[in-house]
């Protein structure tokens, strides 16, 4: 989603009950990408939760640490200095306002366009060469993780073509986006039993998103029964979300996961998210290989461009797929 620059106060941002220690979800699926059973584990996690943690992913700790330290340095600048990297229409620096329809959250961010496995040349933010180099090294690594995960999905689903899914994000013109989010501590609510919304509940419209954060918790996912649970933070691992488009490609076998971020009252949270989307003209419909004999598609066919435009017109928490579901 797009976050637009603006300075609304805390009282304009929705409040949530502060996470309780009992809300921590110990059942997050963990996939070891180097294990022989990775493909089956990925499919099982996508079917049950639409969400999982990836370990043994091959991205060096130093690569992740450098990107994080440079992001912290950027967000530590004065507000006028940060504002020179915005406003985000859609790319660049933004703060607080989420989307075009009134959603707000307690965060500031950088939204960046990608060409292949690096920042787009036309994307001049960030201007700092050291920050750009650190991000490009990180993006190259996390994109490889996304490709490996999607190849594991294909294998686990029994699709003969290994890159049936991953080719959608490696194709020329694929719509890849990278986001750096900073959730400052919100001390105004400390001790009141409630927390400010960092980023409101939503699903991601793309195929997959791959997230990594610092050691500060805040990410929550909704289980199938509607219960919200907190995801234990792990700065050495990646977390993968199934997106709406992948839900359609699998005809609902994989479910896009609803998630949100609750701002911490004491510590900053910094997160990096790679969003893997297909080319704008790519048609999105259930893969024929995944439809059983006589099984009908649950969705009307659409292009990624059509779905992306529909997403930008919606509120953050809207069920964007509803208008494409066959009745």
From Swiss-Prot:
InterPro entries assigned to the protein according to its UniProt record, in alphabetical order: DIOX_N (IPR026992), IPNS-like_FE2OG_OXY (IPR044861), IPNS-like_sf (IPR027443), Iron_ascorbate_oxido_reductase (IPR050231), Oxoglu/Fe-dep_dioxygenase_dom (IPR005123)
UniProt protein name: Gibberellin 2-beta-dioxygenase 3
Keyword Oxidoreductase recorded: yes
PROSITE patterns xref list: FE2OG_OXY (PS51471)
Molecular-function GO terms, alphabetical: gibberellin 2-beta-dioxygenase activity; metal ion binding
Function: Catalyzes the 2-beta-hydroxylation of several biologically active gibberellins, leading to the homeostatic regulation of their endogenous level. Catabolism of gibberellins (GAs) plays a central role in plant development. In vitro, converts GA1, GA20, and GA29 to the corresponding 2-beta-hydroxylated products GA8, GA29-catabolite, respectively.
Catalytic reactions of this protein: gibberellin A1 + 2-oxoglutarate + O2 = gibberellin A8 + succinate + CO2
Note: Plants overexpressing GA2OX3 exhibit extremely dwarf phenotype and are unable to achieve phase transition from vegetative to reproductive growth.
Annotated Fe cation binding sites: 202, 204, 259
Tissue-specific expression: Expressed in roots, shoot apex, leaf blades, leaf sheaths, stems and flowers.
Coiled coil: none
Induction: Induced by gibberellin.
Location of the Fe2OG dioxygenase domain: 173-278
Listed EC numbers: 1.14.11.13
Gene encoding the protein: GA2OX3
Binding of 2-oxoglutarate, residues: 183, 269, 271
Pfam family, one: DIOX_N
Needed cofactors: L-ascorbate; Fe(2+)
Family: Belongs to the iron/ascorbate-dependent oxidoreductase family. GA2OX subfamily.
């Amino acid at each position: 989603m797009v976050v637009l620059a603006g300075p609304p106060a805390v009282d304009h941002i929705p409040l949530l009950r502060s996470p309780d220690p009992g809300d921590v979800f110990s059942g997050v699926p963990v996939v070891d990408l180097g294990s022989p059973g990775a493909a089956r584990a990925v499919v099982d996690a996508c079917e049950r939760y639409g969400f999982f943690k990836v370990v043994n992913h091959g991205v060096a700790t130093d690569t992740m640490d450098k990107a994080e330290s440079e992001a912290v340095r950027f967000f530590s600048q004065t507000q006028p200095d940060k504002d020179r990297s915005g406003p985000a229409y859609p790319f660049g620096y933004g703060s607080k306002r989420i989307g075009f329809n009134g959603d707000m959250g307690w965060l500031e961010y950088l939204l960046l366009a990608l060409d292949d496995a690096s920042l787009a040349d036309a994307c001049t933010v960030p201007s700092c060469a050291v920050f750009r180099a650190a991000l490009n090294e990180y993006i190259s690594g996390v994109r490889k993780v996304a490709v490996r995960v999607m190849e594991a999905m294909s294998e686990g689903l029994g699709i003969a073509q290994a890159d049936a899914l991953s080719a959608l994000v490696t194709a020329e013109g694929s719509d890849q986006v990278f986001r750096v989010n900073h959730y400052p501590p919100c001390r105004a609510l400390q001790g009141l039993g409630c927390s400010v919304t960092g980023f409101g509940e939503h699903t991601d419209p793309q195929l997959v998103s791959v997230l990594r954060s610092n050691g500060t918790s805040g990410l929550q996912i909704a289980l199938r029964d509607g219960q919200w649970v907190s995801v234990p933070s792990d700065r050495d691992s990646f977390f993968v979300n199934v997106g709406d488009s992948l839900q359609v490609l699998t005809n609902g076998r994989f479910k896009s996961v609803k998630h949100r971020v609750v701002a911490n009252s004491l510590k900053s949270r910094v997160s990096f998210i790679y969003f893997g989307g297909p080319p704008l003209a790519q048609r999105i419909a259930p893969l024929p290989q995944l439809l059983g004999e006589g099984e009908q598609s649950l969705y009307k066919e659409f292009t990624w461009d059509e779905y992306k435009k529909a997403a930008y017109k919606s509120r953050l928490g809207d069920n964007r797929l509803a208008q494409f579901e066959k009745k």
